[in-house]
């Protein structure tokens, strides 16, 4: 892991970020003391679901738990009280 002074980070941000993007961990220092570590973002591996597990989760999920109640309340409403649309 290399060290970069905050001054160098300020003056050459793009260069330091290129090094990080290339896989290098960079410690940022202020007055010679470490204050932060820049590390490259490592993509998370996706965990694939089997078709059976996916369908099981899909069937068990409800997008909006209150939707049924909201629809029941609105079922009797009309727009007659709004008057004619011109």
Swiss-Prot record:
InterPro entries: Antitoxin_Phd/YefM (IPR006442), phD-YefM_TA_antitoxins (IPR051416), YefM-like_sf (IPR036165). Disulfide bonds: none annotated. The keyword Transcription does not apply. The keyword Transport does not apply. One of its GO terms (biological process) is positive regulation of growth. One of its GO terms (molecular function) is toxic substance binding. Keywords: Toxin-antitoxin system. The C-terminal domain (residues 55-86) does not neutralize non-cognate antitoxin VapC4; exchanging the N-terminus (residues 1-54) with VapB4 however allows neutralization of VapC4, while exchanging the C-terminal domain (residues 55-86) does not. Forms a complex with VapC5. PANTHER family: ANTITOXIN VAPB46, ANTITOXIN VAPB49-RELATED-RELATED. Probable antitoxin component of a type II toxin-antitoxin (TA) system. The cognate toxin is VapC5. Belongs to the phD/YefM antitoxin family. NCBIfam families: phd_fam (TIGR01552). This is Putative antitoxin VapB5. The gene is vapB5.
């Amino acid at each position: 892991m290399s060290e970069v002074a905050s001054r160098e980070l300020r003056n050459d941000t793009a260069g330091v970020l290129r090094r990080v993007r290339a896989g290098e961990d960079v410690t940022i220092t202020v007055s010679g003391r470490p204050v932060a570590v820049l590390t490259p973002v490592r993509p998370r591996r996706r965990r694939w679901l089997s078709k059976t597990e996916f369908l099981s989760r899909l069937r068990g999920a409800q997008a909006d738990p209150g939707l049924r109640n909201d629809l029941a309340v609105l079922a009797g409403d009309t727009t007659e009280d709004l008057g004619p649309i011109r």
